[in-house]
Amino acid sequence: MYDNLKSLGITQPEDVDRYSLRQEANNDILKIYFRKDKGEFFAKSVKFKYPRQRKTVVSDNASHGYKEINEINPNLRYVIDELDQLCKRDQIEVDLKRKILDDLRHLESVVTNKIAEIEADLEKLTNGR
């Protein structure tokens, strides 16, 4: 799993925290950030430079027969797919954690209100005698 990341020398893909992608001239620059260890100020990162793929395609303008376009490198596309899987998984885990915490807070509120209601009923019973 994560063969493309491993081919880049990333031996522990599960340590990937996030990534950024930018275009610089005819290159795409991919920067991968890893989770910080305790006591570190900055996250470790690695940078990769991919040349953009040049393609000649039929022009939609009738007067010009062909035009040259630049596209993302196919290998980079595969790497980004794997990075998206990793980063999305982390987001799903965070969302699930947030949902569980919200459910706990709601349950706590419901139980607190129910206890107050029962105590009020008990108070009515003891004061009624």
Curated annotation (Swiss-Prot):
Q: Which domain of life is it from?
A: Bacteria
**InterPro entries linked to this entry:** UPF0325
Stored HAMAP family: UPF0325
Protein family (similarity comment) = Belongs to the UPF0325 family.
* Record's protein name: UPF0325 protein YPO1040/y3141/YP_2811
Which species expresses this protein natively? Answer: Yersinia pestis
Upper lineage: Bacteria, Pseudomonadati, Pseudomonadota, Gammaproteobacteria, Enterobacterales
